[in-house]
């Protein structure tokens, strides 16, 4: 049995794991929300132009919503891969998938240039994004959680979640800056800039993850030979109740989150008459507040329990959802 790491070295390793988890998660969700914001503002005009504006917007959102069906597949697929080959290698794969698809979306010709192939290719690349984010989300959480000290699991587990809102903040900021261009320039090339420049962020994330070691839990399982051949099937067979409960808990908070983070932009601009900048600024403020509060709630869950924190926040958010 190997000797435990010295305390200072262990703390340094944990910090590196948290940085890798947060950075990769932020980059992947930056890519993810770029698509959502672009779907709200430009995709209906560039990839579905032959439809009524409302129908075109619905089709753009439909392409965005595809990931809700693809992400579980990506989650199951990369959970299996992660349990077989390790967390680090799996997270490199998911980040590469997400980043590559995002850059290619920024390079896509529009309907005006290649006709029906434009929306088809857009949807295919969105499917690839869905597979990548499905694997990234669970993998980043697992990476942080398996490195966490026993009494700080909530705080460590909250760090990748900050990547969601931080990615949304950065994506909205990027589109907001480009939306300051004249409308014709924004539609012609401005919206593409954040997609293409995201390649730099992806390489940064890959570099950070390349220097990360495997988690202690995975190395211990591999050394003992206790690595399941079919981990997903065993999980569904032995822990199906827990899986269903976790999925249900996630649905309750995920549905309103996406309404307030993506749909609200087009609704504010097209139905309420707000300027694009005002709608995007509102989303950015919400993302900033969430980014600051998420680790606080993770810390609090270590003090008073996960159930109390979750149920309290669900009750607090209920009046807002009914008003929306």
List where the protein language model places each region.
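Extracytoplasmic gate region of multi-pass secondary transporters
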Residues: 36, 241-286
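Extracellular/periplasmic helix-loop-helix junction of adjacent transmembrane segments
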Residues: 40-71
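Central cavity-lining transmembrane alpha-helices of secondary-active solute carriers
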Residues: 62-80, 101, 284-296
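Cytoplasmic membrane-interface "Motif A"-like loop-to-helix N-cap segments
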Residues: 84-95, 303-313
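Hydrophobic core of transmembrane alpha-helices in multi-pass small-molecule transporters
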Residues: 115-133
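Glycine-rich segments within core transmembrane alpha-helices of 12-TM secondary carriers
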Residues: 155-176
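Flexible cytoplasmic inter-helical loops of multi-pass small-molecule transporters
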Residues: 210-231
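Residue-level detector of conserved catalytic or cofactor/ligand-binding positions
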Residues: 312-320, 324
